[in-house]
Structure formats: C-alpha cells, structure tokens
Amino acid sequence: MGDRIVRPLVAGFVALAFVIQAFSGSVYAAAAPPVDNSIYAELLTKYVVNGHVNYAGFKRDEARLDQYLKVLEQVDPERLQREEQFAFYINAYNAWTIKLILTGYPGVKSIKDLGSLLQSPWKKEFVRINGKTLTLDDIEHTILRPRFKDPRVHFAIVCASKSCPPLISEPYLGAVLDAQLNRSTRDFLNTPANYRLDRNTFWVSSIFKWFAEDFNKDVVGFYLKFAQGELKEKLQAGRDRIDVTYLDYDWSLNGV
C-alpha cells in the first residue's frame, strides 16, 4: 500500500524537477543572448579588404569603434555559451588590437612601436571587459589558449602585423565558429607567402615555433589536416623525411 503511494510521489517530484530545470535553463539562456556584433560587422566590411586593414578609415570612424568596445565592455563572458564565449574573446582581442594601433596612428609602423623597453604592447592593461582591465596577453594566454585548447585560434587572432593571419571581414560568431576557424586556418596555411617547401625542408610560420605545444609538436601533421592540392600531396609523400624550419616574422603593420 505504502509503496503504491510513494512511487507516484517520487515520479511526480522527478517530473517537477525536469520542469524546473527546463524553466531555469530557458531563463538563463534568455539572460545571456549572443553578443551584438553589428557595429563591428559594419566596420570590418568597410575597412578590411583581403585581410588588410584600412587604419585611416578606422581612425575616422574611431567613435564607432569605441561604441563597439563599449558593447564588449558590458558583456559578462562567463554567462555566454561556450562557442559564443570563444568567439567573444577572439573578437575582443582583434577589436582592442585595432584600438591599440589607433592610439599611435598614423605614426605607427609596427605594433611593436607601441611598446617600450620595460613593457611590450601585449602587456598593456587597456582592455576593458565586465569591470576588469586586461592585457592582450591575458586574453590569449590566460583565456583563449588554456580554456579552449584549440590551435586554430592562432589563425583567428590578429596581431596587426603582415606575418600574422589576415583579419577576416566579419566577426567571429558562435553559431558558425567551427566553420570560420577552419576557413581562417586553411586560408593561412595554404597561402604561399606563409610556407615554402624545398625538397625535404619545410619553412612555416614562426607561430608553429612559438606555440609548438599547441600543435603537439607535429607541424606536418597539423598542416595535413588543412593543406590542399599539390602541397598536401608533397607533404604526404615526404612526411617521414621532412625537416621543419621557420620563416622570419614581418612585424610591419598589416595596413592597406
């Protein structure tokens, strides 16, 4: 008798728990919608062409960029879904890097000009997010790399230099982030300026040297996931004999 009473009660509590969980989940989701990147999308469309940045245009529209940075500043990234959070920090890195360049533009010839003997530009505390002041290094090395553990991020964040991956002319978005990261990685790795294969010597970007651990110390293996055409064929054919070395890095500004 008692058992017949208890079972429906338990079932009722379980059902109620599912309803509460679903309701609370919907409330949480409603409280953390995707970030509004419309201003950034507008600016990128106007001032980024084939990966080259029109800093003069951004300078004229700096107030508009500041509006977008204010949007980022007011976001609580911890309340975003994982892919939205990943995209948020990529966009934040790139947008704040543009802002950094504008602090010295038009006189700046390299992002390194904005540093000093005692402080690199990547260690400047000027990035404002959710009541905190961060550095570009904080975003890259304390958040993006350790939290998301995705080496493709190295081809999405842009350090305003010619040897960096090109800035794409659209924001990164959580809903299509995987496809965007694949495209950015594939485009960079297959651009002839970013590699040279001469017999058994393979010159690649210094990114692979600086962040070897992120690529499991297997440059060729990573390349084979994204290489196309003749490059892929040659890498596959000579994989066991290839020696990897690194191209010089051009830190001059990635402007038009």
Which residue stretches match the model-derived regions?
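Low-complexity, intrinsically disordered tandem-repeat tracts enriched in small/polar residues
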Residues: 6, 22-24, 209
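Bacterial N-terminal signal peptides
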Residues: 11-22
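Boundary at the C-terminal end of the N-terminal hydrophobic targeting segment
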Residues: 24-31
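Interaction/scaffold regions that mediate signaling and macromolecular assembly across diverse proteins
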Residues: 32-256
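N-terminal secretory signal peptides that target proteins for export/translocation
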Residues: 1-7
